[in-house]
Structures are given as C-alpha cells and as structure tokens.
Swiss-Prot record:
Motif ('KMSKS' region): 236-240
Source organism per UniProt: Shewanella sp. (strain ANA-3)
Major location (coarse): cytoplasm
Cofactor note: Binds 1 zinc ion per subunit.
Quaternary structure, from the entry: Monomer.
Descriptive protein name: Glutamate--tRNA ligase
Record: residues binding Zn(2+): 98, 100, 125, 127
UniProt family annotation: Belongs to the class-I aminoacyl-tRNA synthetase family. Glutamate--tRNA ligase type 1 subfamily.
High-level lineage: Bacteria, Pseudomonadati, Pseudomonadota, Gammaproteobacteria, Alteromonadales
Family annotation (InterPro entries): aa-tRNA-synth_I_cd-bd (IPR045462), aa-tRNA-synth_I_codon-bd_sub2 (IPR020751), aa-tRNA-synth_I_CS (IPR001412), aa_tRNA-synth_I_cd-bd_sf (IPR008925), Glu-tRNA-ligase_bac/mito (IPR004527), Glu/Gln-tRNA-synth (IPR000924), Glu/Gln-tRNA-synth_Ib_cat-dom (IPR020058), GluQ/Sye (IPR049940)
GO MF assignments: ATP binding; glutamate-tRNA ligase activity; tRNA binding; zinc ion binding
Pfam families in the record: Anticodon_2, tRNA-synt_1c
Motif 'HIGH' region positions after renumbering to this chain: 9-19
Catalyzed reaction equations: tRNA(Glu) + L-glutamate + ATP = L-glutamyl-tRNA(Glu) + AMP + diphosphate
C-alpha cells in the first residue's frame, strides 16, 4: 500500500513554525516511504478563513520547498460530497436530525456543570422518529454506546477513549454547513490518506473521527500526534517569543534549509547529529523516532544553523535568496560585482541574509560620508602618506586581480617602513566607509578599480581638510 500523508492547515492565519514542522514531518513520512503528500486547505470556517491567509500558506510551503503531489484541495469546494455522505448516513441510521434548541442545549450544559458532570449532549433526539417539519435542525453522528476506541499513535503509543465519554457529534450545522471533524473524515477517506501527522491538540478529535470512519466502512489511517513547541521560557510559543510566521523568517534573513533543519530537530533526532540536508532527512526520518516531550524553541541554534548554511551552500544558490533582501533594502546590484562573489567574500561574517545585504551595500553604492568614529580613528594626518602612495600603486596596476592588489598594499607598507595596519585601516575606511570588511585585497577587487580610486581620493581630500582645519 502506498504511503499517503497530508498537511491540512486552516487559512485563518499565516503558516507558523508549529504548522511548518507538522507539514515537514508529514512530508518526510511520505518521501521516506516513496509515498505521496497531499495539501488540503480546511476552510470550512468561512467567517475566519481568508484568501490572504491561504496565499501566505502556499507561499510558505513553496519557500520551504515542501512540494505536494496532490492539491491544494479546498473543503469549501467539496460541500456536495459531504452532503452526499450525510444523506447516506441519515438513510442508514448512523446519523440523525437533532431539533434541540440552543436554549435547551445551554440549559443542559448548565445543569451538567452544576452537578459536576461532563458536558455532553444527552441524545434527546437520537431515537426519535423522522419529522415532517420546517423546524431548524443539526445533523448528529450516532456515536457508539459502550466499548472504547483504541489506536496506536506513532509518537504516544497506545491511546484509548471510552465511547461513553464521547457525545453525538454535530456533523452539519443548522445552515447545512458540514463541520470540521466530519469533513476531515470524508477527505481522508476520499484522498486515501494512510497516515495522519498533526499536533497533539487533535488527539481528542481522533476517537470521534475513527468512529465516523468505522460507520462509513472506511479504512482507519495511522496517527502521529506531535507535541507543541514551547518558547525558551517554557510557555507555549507565541508572537512575544519572536517571529512565528514562516515568511517572517524569510524576511529576517534565514535560508529555508536552516529553518527546515532546525524544525526537524524540534522533536526528532538521529543520534547526536545536528546538521541534516533535506536528502538526509528523507533517508533517516521515522515517525517512531519523534519525542513526545514538548520542544523548546532556541533562536540561537537557528542562527547557528543559518550561519552554517550561508557558509557551506553553493554561493550562487545563497545569492538567489540574498537578491530578495538586496531588493528589499533597495540596493541595485546591476552596477557592481556578481552577488555570488559577494556571498563568498562575506559569508564568514554573516548571521543572516538581511545582515549580509546591509553589509554589502558599499560594493554597489557610494557612501555619502565616512563612519564618524572610524574616520576619527583612522583618517588622521598620519594616514595621508599611506593613502597617497597606495593610490599611486593601485593606479599603476595593469591587471586588477586580488594578488596584484595584495602586492600593492604590501609594497606600500614596505616602502614606508610601517606595519600593514598603518596602510590597511585607513584604506579600509576609505573604500568601505566603515571599519570592517573582508580581506582588503578581495574587497578592493570586488569594488572595482575606478570606484576604489575615487573613494581613496575622497579619503585623501578628507584627511587634507582635517589637517588644514
């Protein structure tokens, strides 16, 4: 039997990291078993579902590279199918119409609460004969009485629920709209889902859904309920812990590989290995290896992984993601070095692509003024001669190569009988406007000969004005 999994988000908000981890685990379960992965949009909550949220979910999945084999399916486009099954269940007696008013249901719950009883429907309409009436009604599933529902969860082991603790679930509201728990069952059945991976908040839905599947004569999928993600303070992860939307991590400068690697380790492990490529995840992933204890989100670990991938992935690939940040920061990369070369030069220093973009601006744009602190420290009178001499030597170069630039800087220090720092620091401030950059030879090479000479001239003029003031 082909393994078939699904990710079924509700489009009432953005794709958050908890949902992304669930999607990843479900995707990996399919890929690890040469199966299929289905994307389903559970939009039956019509009032809260939005197209913007749906678009954001698809954008997040695409950015992460979690491609789907079927879908996206939309529940709101399957109402005819749900109504067909409801009519069939009413005919077979596995569902019934309930005419109880809201007032009666509220009074029942109040009485049960006052008596310390579990709040559940009492089956008032369960065995009533059919009515020919225009009274509003809901449709309820006729849950089995007695016995229990038992299933083996890949994460939590054997779980058992007493049927007597379950009431007769509403499967269609008074307006005819089918409910979440019912739609999920029909979808999983129709789509041939063999394994359901979802959050632990769905555990209580599982016995209800299993009973409906049994009533329909449908196969029961396997289940894996993963634990929640906590903040580093032990509380449930929320906006106050930082970014929770997947695309916010994109905006903050994280690579999808880093986020995927981090998310897979929030509950799953393979020995003490920390770094996993997507291919390695597909080869090694097993649902049974997921820890049932909650995982704490640690931004420092995510940053570490991001640095690792910025440094180790193909610079051309990193540059393709960096371009978004260059555009976002309005840095025109058409007039300057290849972005992949900048990635190679700056990768060791960058924690995020957002930082990398900001620190690469001087390769593409001239700066209006020097950093005040660095200029005060390094563009002083003693810097005039080193700047003038190194400018002459750089101007005389017939080939603008990293090696030739390095030799020109060294020759300047040798000729002036000073340490490299006496030449290098004023030169660095001159061409970058600041005090930090990669090696000066590669920095000058990437900036280009003409632009480097112009900036050195500007620095010489700055120092001269300072001497004369």
């Amino acid at each position: 039997m082909t393994t078939k999994t699904r990710f079924a988000p509700s489009p009432t908000g953005f794709l958050h990291v908890g949902g992304a981890r669930t999607a990843l685990y479900s995707w990996l379960q399919a890929r690890a078993n040469n199966g299929e992965f289905v994307l389903r949009i559970e939009d039956t909550d019509i009032e809260r579902s939005t197209q913007a949220a749906c678009d954001a979910i698809l954008e997040g999945m695409n950015w992460l590279g979690l491609t789907w084999d079927e879908g996206p399916y939309y529940q709101t486009k399957r109402f005819d199918r749900y109504n067909e099954i409801i009519a069939q269940m009413l005919e077979q007696g596995t569902a019934y119409k309930c005419y109880c008013s809201r007032e009666r249901i509220d009074a029942l719950r109040e009485a049960q609460a006052a008596n310390g009883e579990a709040q559940k429907y009492d089956g008032c309409c369960r065995d009533l004969p059919a009515r020919d009436t225009d009274e509003p009604f809901v449709v309820r599933f006729k849950n089995p009485i007695g016995g229990s529902v038992v299933f083996d969860d890949h994460v939590r082991g054997r779980i058992e629920f007493s049927n007597d603790a379950l009431d007769d679930l509403i499967i269609a509201r008074t307006d005819g709209v089918p409910t979440y728990n019912f739609c999920v069952v029909v979808d999983d059945w129709d789509m041939g889902i063999t394994c359901v991976v979802r959050g632990e908040d769905h555990i209580n839905n599982t016995p209800r859904q299993i009973n409906i599947l049994k009533a329909l004569g449908a196969p029961i999928p396997e289940y894996a309920h993963v634990s929640m993600i906590l903040g580093d303070d032990g509380a449930k992860l929320s906006k106050r812990h930082g970014a929770v939307s997947v695309m916010q991590y994109r905006d903050d400068g994280y690579l999808p590989e880093a986020l995927l690697n981090y998310l897979v380790r929030l509950g799953w492990s393979h020995g003490d290995q920390e770094v996993f490529s997507l291919e390695e995840m597909k080869q090694l992933f097993k649902l049974d290896d997921i820890n049932k204890a909650p995982s704490a989100f640690n931004t420092e670990k995510l940053v570490w992984l991001n640095q690792h991938y910025i440094k180790t992935l193909d610079p051309e690939y990193v540059a393709s993601h960096l371009q978004w940040h260059m555009d976002d920061q309005k840095i025109d990369t058409s007039n300057g070095p290849a972005l992949s070369a900048v990635v190679t030069a700056l990768a060791e220093r960058a924690k995020t692509l957002k930082e990398l973009a900001a620190s690469s601006r001087y390769f593409y744009e001239d700066f209006a003024e020097f950093d005040a602190e660095q200029a005060k420290k390094h563009l002083r009178g003693v810097a005039l001669e080193p700047l003038q001499l190194v400018q002459q030597k750089l101007a005389a170069l017939t080939e603008w190569t990293v090696e030739a630039i390095h030799q020109a800087i060294e020759a300047t220090a040798t000729e002036l009988e000073v340490g490299m720092g006496k030449v290098g620091m004023p030169l660095r401030v001159a061409v970058t406007g600041a005090g930090q950059s990669p090696g000066l030879d590669i920095t000058l090479f990437l900036i280009g000969k003409a632009r480097s000479e112009q900036r050195i001239s500007k620095a010489i003029e700055f120092v001269a004005d300072r001497i004369n003031s």
